[in-house]
Amino acid sequence: MENKNRLVLLDILRAIGVMLMIEGHTIDAVMSPIYKDGSSILFQFWTFFRGLTAPFFFFSAGFAFVIATVKDKGEVLTVPARAMKRRLRRIIVLLLIGYGLHMPLQMFYDPSAVPQSAWDIFFIADALQIISLSLLVILLIALFTKKKENLLKSYIIAASLSLIIAPLTEPIKWETYLPHLVYPYLTFRAGSFFTFFPFSGYLFAGAAFSAAALSFPANDRARLLSKNFKRASMVSLILFVLFFPIQLLFVSPYVDYWRALPAVNFLRFGLVTSIAALVGYLSLQVTRFPKILPAIGKSSLTIYVVHLMIVYGSPVNIGLAQLLPGGVHPIVAVLIAVVVMTLMFGMVYAIEVYRSRRRRLAAIIIGDVTK
């Protein structure tokens, strides 16, 4: 039951992230600009909570990566060779998909015809690129750290530095020192939606909680994880209260305030861990959850890619954003988001049915062969 609870906790966090992602992307893409009023409290509230999507995804990705990769051999931690190869393959796939979603179609038949603006979009750092690079760092730390306490400390230090250091790294003119392929990972000025600092911090934080879980007794892991989530949320919210007035005095608003500055990221991390604690305690009380939840977790990458193609289009198709260039009323946008979400969950259900039937067929074939 313990292992089941722990997995359910992670599955629910992923499901929350998926729902926030689909809702946020769809409404943002199809809602008319005239309703995106920055002076509206309701719009500001929606915008802020939309900003929790990436932290949920990144945090759960870091947590799941360490749980699936690092094996506890008593006093020593190991990364099995097979697991390392699979994780490296996963990292490369994430990176290729991330760039593939922004690839100019002309690149396939006439690269010289690709305008500079299209190349700029191709090179921006998006969620999958940041996840892949962060997971590579997480893997390297795990490979060179053999003790549980050292692994935990390493991830905590990495998370803290990443969340705090962004105000120092953002003003640097990386474009004058680094190639076009690299500097978008370090500055929002390149048009990147996410940068390594501070967003890798959420993955490192997830990895830290996962590393801590390696030391917990198996029969009490979910409860102790939930307790740690609660403590982390309280510390993060206190840091938000402390950092917010300080950075107003000493940090100039040089860039998108809601993405780069530490206080806001402490607030977001505090909310993510608060929800994680609530989900953790809930998983200890509820014995059965809908089977669709773990399926959503397993198919989160597929959902990410397919829903982006539906909403924003891709090099091979047009999306809702192109079909509705003028946008729609917010209520209509919400209804469209519900439809897209329903389609994605229907796709997940179909995938699970296919996998189940394939396994059943394989079992029948193997049984017949061995008779």
Language-model segment annotations:
Residues 1-371:
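Alpha-helical transmembrane segments and their immediate juxtamembrane cytosolic regions
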